[in-house]
């Protein structure tokens, strides 16, 4: 392949980081151990904060077995990772999300539910610092993007939980 031809392969040593969720009573985690293996196979390294999966029922050893590196220090997740995955981040976490704002740096990418309308000031601040944000709740609800539709999938799960509770 020539140097002018774009590659679909991720750059070598790309690191995805998953810090523990800080939104009150949030039990979800942004990445399950099964997905760690998929990312590893694609050449992406995964680091996860120790205990991040516990509220969702995933033990640290499951992440380690899938190939993730466990890190105790939350700040180190933000220092080492190019891409940060969180369930509720930025404006979607008004009480604690600002704690992470100072940890994000220029060139970093933040993926999660960001609530960019209610948290517009937070989002503008991140953009001004050169942080790229993907607000998953704004993905179009079309057939082609259905596998990434976080609103429908999470609403369905919440509905089942309400019936069973």
Residue ranges of model-derived segments:
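Glycine/serine-rich phosphate-binding loop and adjoining beta1-alpha1 elements at the start
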Residues: 2-15, 21, 92, 96-165
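Short phosphate-binding/catalytic loops that engage adenosine nucleotides
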Residues: 44, 68, 131
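Short acidic low-complexity segments
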Residues: 67-80
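N-terminal phosphate-binding or glycine-rich loops at protein starts, especially the Walker A/P-loop
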Residues: 3-4, 9-50
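Conserved acidic residues
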Residues: 81-82, 108
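N-terminal beta-loop-helix "entrance" segment that forms/cooperates
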Residues: 47-70
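Short glycine-/small-residue-rich Rossmann-like dinucleotide-binding loops
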Residues: 82, 88-89, 114-115
